Amino acid sequence: MLKLKRITSVICSALLVLAIVGCSSDNFEPIPLTDDETEILAAMGDDVNVITDDDYSHTIIELQAHPGNYSGQVYQLEGVYTTESINGVDTSFVYRTLVHDGEKTICGLHLKYLEKEIPDGAWIRVTAIIGTEDYDGETCTVMEVVAVEALAEAGQSQLEWDGVGHQH
């Protein structure tokens, strides 16, 4: 559990600035799927686990806590896109802000192999294979991007949350 708290702390610290400033995709041009991405998604069919607003917090927390259980599975989710410098390397994330009893917590995942230029703060839909990566000796969950698009309209960047899995 201490490892999860440490990993979550690193991710939350990297994203905290954006939570304070706030984000929206109102000023961004949509970035559509490429033809290749569209073909790949069609081929995946029902093998994609779609994370909805209602199950976002529990699913992301579960993916972070037990990445090995989900490695190789395909997930799709929407959220705010950002990059942060971690150990001098620009690192991409998709996240949402969870609200519980007035307290806000950033909850998201690292994006790997993102080939498109997406502006910080854009609302994206990403489909990716769950993988793991070593970070300072800890196993972290990553989303190995298969397809990503920046959408014209943003969804809910803040979601109500029951606090289960909450880290202090």
Show where each model-derived region lies.
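OB-fold and OB-like single-stranded nucleic-acid-recognition modules
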Residues: S13, A19-H168
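Sec-dependent bacterial lipoprotein signal peptides
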Residues: M1-V21
